Regions:
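Carbohydrate-binding surfaces of carbohydrate-active enzymes
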Residues: 79, 93, 98, 134-165, ...
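N-terminal secretory signal peptides
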Residues: 1-17, 31-35
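Mature extracytoplasmic enzyme cores
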Residues: 63-75, 80, 92-107, 111, ...
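Short strand-edge motifs at loop-to-beta-strand transitions and within beta-strands
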Residues: 789-791, 919-921, 963-965
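C-terminal segment of N-terminal export signals and the immediately downstream linker at the start
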Residues: 15, 37-62
Length: 1023
């Protein structure tokens, strides 16, 4: 940005802020800023430099060895966060695609995921799908440009399998065998003795207009049994079912109901296409229809289209160099009836051992609602078997087949394996990269389900579609993003795909450019369109650096977990947690993951030295409870119970909650399985390493009785979350003072208590890894007790930290195994320049006990200045306003003098301003300010992102959750200039520049709100 405007000289008091005097020094038009449209100018050089050099280590580089300083401080591109990159189908220009790749690379990100999404486009005429649709020549040209530029910049490109979601191709119709299908039903009611003669009943729910074909699968009659009715379902008697399919002639059936005094229903079951198209289409010409996700034909339709239309020779060559993963969004298959695939009856009989068709009435759906039921237990069992079969077909014919195909040209498969009643835990184990989402997941246990599948399979990455908020367009703050994601990382997430980055321009869009999800039906949309259009992009490399370091730690080595929770039904995105562990165990330091039956057939499912999957998550106990998704009944497959028996005989502790004496298999008992199960369970419960309890409050005591304690334990119950990884002899512990769900009551409060960590060797010492700055230092105060280390953790809500336990000398540390403090009355004891140092913020004598010989050292500190609240600020504002085009920003410069800090909406001149503000003040320090003196700068409340400069020196990135900065040695005797640069969202400006969409949004309290305090400290060497 350049400032070619002159500043006015007028100054006047503004009475709009009570108890504050705001002097407006000037306001004038500034330079125009454009960031992306191929028809516009390049992003201003000043902003490009700001994004490219924003953090201490912003750019991807060659990875250092694990345990080295550079390994943590400067993670390489493959570890760095990615953007979901939304294109308006193929209406893109290769030059603009290359420019946006550069913007993302310069900002310190490691990759993109290309998706054809345009929910904000209400007028389909804007997009000529014949010329610019997904899969068109222009789409392929965009792919080639993205891959080519990504290769140059060291990024990876993920490719979505179809336009928007779910996966669809334009080479099929709803009547094609490869299209997603449903089983619809027609029904006629008959009284006892009544005769039906005529066409078989037509479906009660009309087909999609595009689905012209319907095939009759079966015709059945069954008597109503009100004893089996529920509040929403009509009860039926399965023993009375009559199969009339063979009696159908020319589409008609004749049948007389028994004259038994009952009411009868005549069902016709019709197989037809759902006609589902991908979200917010059309995206192609001809129209793309969603494929059958449960058959080889559906998968073949995907692979055939890619092979013929997308995988050109240049694309194949570039994928080999810059390709990342093929991506599929959540399984949002929509049906007015029951999802189906033609081979389902035969596959069901082969896999479950009995005929599915007699049980169809208990499976039928009408607009997602169950309509009929047999007896409660029978209905639950049959529905379990149905969805288990569907899950297996999805995993076999869709996930496994696509994964194998994608690998042939160099792509992994990343997918969100939820949305149906299928075993997402099992699917997560099959995928190269399973993915969850912050918008759709109810709480952290949803991530723990996918993490269990990932870790039992021996994979590394659990990805997350991150930071989408309903109504959050152009008002999403990075602080909110960080608070959301902090807990997800503790639950197993270690790859962030940010939602998202929109292509710059589209005809007819308003400033600040094309955004995939806003406006949404005329209102504020969801998700954010990050990029240079945002003022906070100036600080974006601080965010990418932080996220990259989180990933680096949480992708290191192997996970370490405490307990595996067995799930009979492997759903996720449900918010259903684990008894005791979710509510009580996690707040005490325990960690758990969920596993399901298919995971027990993996090579990792072995017990070694009493540990399950010792080479992976290393579960030290197994917990089994009733199936929440089957009416909280105690169910287990016989084969699973037998494996549990083998596990505990090999030494694995197992705790079972509930009455298992009457346990049943989850599916239909077709031959004495219930009796076999109970016999195996009787043996299991008699084992010495097994405990059965009936009260969930007794879980902790049962584990203690078995000698199982958490690897991380807290001195008190708290909101502290943790994740543990082990790599190359080093234990990494990630901590977050986080929330179990996005909205929790009461809100998370600050924590400050002792935490005890298990270490691999008594030689290991603790290091603090600063996720914001990339710096590492040995921790100065802790106690040791054999294989444990105890230290104090104090975190504000949402704040994070990483502790590593390893041999002396890691990360370039020079303190070796020298003595440390075990206790102190000072504010803190730290290693500074290799020497043990006590720090105090008030005059007095401080007593520190050292580890070596338990020696006590007294340190006297005097002359510490009092904390000072900083006032008298000059504020220079870049006011970002709509420019001449949708992608051009007009910058208006404003200069103000503030006697006291206030949020921008409370300053009349800034009430509707978005942009960047630079706050400057001067602090005079006396002659006593010499060696050993320093200060913390507590910024108080800042909205949204910020950076701090002292005497012209830009400091390390600020912790945006707890913005307290150590000014270290940058202060000097005399005058010191402190500058705080703050960047905002665009929400406040859009309220007035585009009121039809954003006018109802509340103003956000931008700026440096404070109070800003200088907190002096004195240091003294004690080592």
């Amino acid at each position: 940005m350049t400032d070619d405007a002159s500043h006015a000289d007028d100054s006047r008091p503004d009475a709009g802020v009570a108890r504050r005097r705001v002097l407006q020094a000037g306001a004038a038009a500034g330079a125009a800023l454009t960031w992306g449209a191929a028809t516009g100018t390049a992003h201003a050089a000043e902003e490009a430099r700001a994004a490219g050099s924003a953090s201490a280590h912003p750019a991807p580089c060659r990875p250092g060895a694990p345990g080295s300083a550079s390994w943590f401080s400067a993670p390489p591109a493959p570890v760095r966060p990615k953007f979901r990159w939304w294109w308006p189908d193929g209406l893109v220009e290769p030059a603009e695609i290359r420019r946006e790749i550069d913007q993302i690379a310069d900002a310190g990100f490691g990759g993109v995921e290309i998706a054809a999404v345009h929910h904000s486009v209400d007028d389909p005429a804007v997009l000529d799908t014949a010329r610019h649709g997904w899969g068109s020549a222009s789409w392929v040209a965009g792919m080639e440009a993205a891959l080519e530029q990504a290769d140059r910049r060291g990024l990876t490109v993920d490719l979505t399998a179809g336009p928007a979601w779910p996966t669809a191709v334009p080479t099929i119709t709803p009547d094609s065998p490869a299209a997603v299908q449903e089983l619809a039903y027609g029904v006629a009611a008959l009284a006892a003795g009544a005769r039906y003669e005529g066409p078989v009943p037509a479906p009660v729910v009309a087909a999609d207009p595009a689905a012209a074909k319907a095939t009759l699968l079966a015709v059945q009659a069954v008597r109503v049994d009100t004893a089996n009715s529920t509040r929403k379902e009509t009860g039926l008697d399965p023993a009375t079912l009559v199969d009339l399919t063979r009696t159908v002639t020319n589409g008609a059936v004749t049948w007389t109901a028994p004259d038994d005094g009952g009411s009868w229903l005549l069902f016709a079951h019709w197989l037809r296409g759902t006609g589902q198209t991908p979200e917010a289409g059309p995206h192609t010409a001809p129209t793309a229809y969603v494929v059958d996700h449960f058959s080889p034909a559906g998968t073949r339709a995907i692979t055939d289209f890619w092979e013929s239309d997308l995988l050109t020779r240049p694309v194949r060559r570039l994928i080999a160099r810059a390709g990342g993963a093929l991506f599929e969004d959540s399984i949002e298959l929509e049906s007015r009836a029951l999802l189906w695939t033609p081979a389902l009856p035969a596959e069901f009989a082969r896999r479950r051992g009995y005929d599915l068709l007699p049980y169809l009435p208990a499976l039928l759906l009408n607009k997602s609602n169950q309509v009929y039921a047999y007896g409660a237990a029978l209905t639950v069992r049959v529905r379990h078997d149905f969805w288990q079969t569907v899950s297996e077909l999805y995993n076999t014919h869709h996930v496994t087949a696509i994964k194998k195909w994608a690998s042939t040209f160099g792509l992994k498969l990343r997918a969100q394996p939820y949305g149906l009643q299928t075993d997402a835990i099992a699917t997560a184990a099959l995928l190269d990269i399973p993915e969850g989402e912050s918008l759709g997941f109810k709480n952290l246990d949803d991530y723990r389900c996918l993490a269990g599948g990932r870790d039992m399979a021996g994979s590394t990455i659990l990805s997350c579609e991150s930071g989408a908020y309903t109504g959050g367009a152009y008002s999403t703050t990075w602080q909110k993003f960080l608070r959301t994601m902090g807990g997800a990382y503790a639950a197993g997430v270690n790859q962030t795909v940010i939602h998202g980055f929109s292509y710059a321009a589209l005809p007819g869009v308003a400033w600040p450019g094309y955004a995939a999800f806003t406006p949404y039906h005329g209102g504020v949309g969801y998700g954010e369109s990050w990029g240079p259009r945002h003022p906070t992009w100036r600080h974006i490399a601080d965010m990418s650096g932080y996220l990259a370091r989180v990933h680096q730690v949480l992708q290191a080595g192997k996970p370490r977990q405490d307990v595996a929770i067995f799930r009979q039904t492997g759903y996720t995105a449900t918010g259903i947690g684990a008894s005791w562990f979710t509510s009580t165990g996690i707040p005490l330091g325990w960690n758990h993951q969920f596993i399901s039956e298919p995971l027990l057939s993996l090579p990792s499912a072995r017990v070694t030295n009493g540990v399950l999957a010792a080479g992976g998550p290393a579960y030290r106990a197994l917990f089994v409870e009733a199936d929440f998704f089957a009416g909280s009944t105690c169910t287990l497959p016989v084969e699973v119970a037998e494996k549990f028996l083998a596990f505990t005989k090999a030494g694995l502790p197992i705790v079972l909650l509930g009455d298992w004496s009457t346990a049943t298999v989850p599916g239909l008992d077709t031959g004495g399985q219930d009796a076999r199960l109970r016999a195996v369970l009787a043996q299991l419960l008699a084992q010495p390493r097994v405990r059965q309890i009936t009260d969930k409050t007794a879980v902790g005591a049962a584990l203690a009785d078995l000698g199982v304690t958490p690897l991380v334990s807290y001195a008190t119950s708290s909101t502290l979350l943790n994740a543990h990884r082990y790599a190359d002899g080093v234990d990494y512990f990630y901590f977050c003072n986080g929330k179990h769900a996005e909205t929790v009551k009461p809100p998370v409060a600050a924590v400050d208590h002792e935490v005890t960590l298990r270490r691999g060797s008594t030689r290991h010492v603790p290091y603090l890894l600063d996720l914001w700055t990339g710096r590492v230092r040995r921790i100065g105060t802790y106690t040791e007790n054999g294989d444990t280390v105890t230290l104090r953790v104090a975190l504000q809500p949402g704040e994070t930290m990483v502790v590593a336990l390893g041999v002396p000398g890691l990360f370039g540390d020079r303190t070796g195994s020298g003595p440390h403090a075990v206790s102190t009355t000072a504010d803190t004891v730290l290693f500074a320049d290799g020497r043990l140092t006590v720090r105090g913020s008030a005059d007095g004598e401080y007593v520190t006990e050292l580890s070596q010989g338990r020696r006590t050292v007294r340190s006297r500190i005097s002359g510490v200045p009092q904390p000072t609240q900083l006032t008298g600020w000059r504020l220079d504002v870049e006011d970002w306003q709509p420019g001449a085009t949708a992608t051009e920003t007009r910058v208006v410069r404003r200069a103000l003098t503030l006697d006291a800090l206030a949020a921008w909406p409370d300053i009349p001149a800034l009430a509707d301003v978005s942009g960047i503000g630079r706050y400057r003040t001067t602090v005079r320090l006396g002659r006593a300010w010499t060696g050993g003196h320093g200060a913390l700068l507590d910024l108080g409340t800042v909205y949204d992102t910020c950076r701090v400069t002292v005497n012209g020196h830009r400091l390390d990135p600020v912790d945006h959750i707890n913005p307290v900065v150590d000014l270290g040695g940058w202060l000097r005797q005399g005058d010191n200039t402190i500058e705080v640069e703050v960047a905002t969202t665009l929400g406040n400006r859009l309220r007035v520049s585009d009121p039809g969409v954003y006018g109802g949004s509340p103003r956000q309290p931008y700026g440096l709100v404070g109070p800003v305090r200088l907190l002096p400290y004195w240091e003294a060497r004690i080592g």
